[in-house]
Amino acid sequence: IYDRRVSSSIAGHIASAINGAAIARDTSFLKDSMDSPIAADTITLVDDPLRPRGLGSSPFDGEGLARQRRVMVENGVLKGWFLDLASARQLGLAPTGNARRGAGSPPSPGTTNWIMEPGDVSRDELIASIEEGFLVTEMIGSSVSLITGDYSRGASGFWIKGGEIQGPVTEATIAGNLKDMLMQITPANDLDFTRSTIAPSLRIDGMTVAGA
């Protein structure tokens, strides 16, 4: 289980994989996945630049185009790319108002308020449903390939046994492939709107845990 303090990293990996610049460069494991299931049907992801008081809210993107709320993944099915003018031109598509401009750098596609919608069960219910597993509360380092989806990260947290939290775990490694991981996600209902990229606590089955 990814606690909501760290689950936004999964949403971030999805955003990077559907970034138009990565699609145009042919460097994303989701490059051929438009209108196809990429995640469990419990997963919907929305980019909402018009959310009131959202940390990433703005009416116009870094190239002056009007922004709009976009459902990017709907019930697990990929519905769109994040595009600026350059990546849209390379892909022969219309820009989507997702250009972000940094100080001294050219515009590039990016998210605004990137939200993985909550599920129907509580975090405690997710924990109680696990016979043996790992509650991840902190991530340490990263080895994630957006080309292949291969995923390996250091993590710490707590061991779960018989649906109950046991002792602490430090310096473990969790590994899998994002293609498989996304298909095995169950979201909790504990979404917390405190950042511009947010996700609820997530149960992901079938991952490898070493060093716990």
What kind of feature is each model-predicted range?
Residues 1-34:
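Active-site pocket-lining segments that scaffold enzyme catalytic pockets across diverse folds
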Residues 7, 31-212:
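Dual-mode signal for accessory low-complexity, basic/Gly-rich regions
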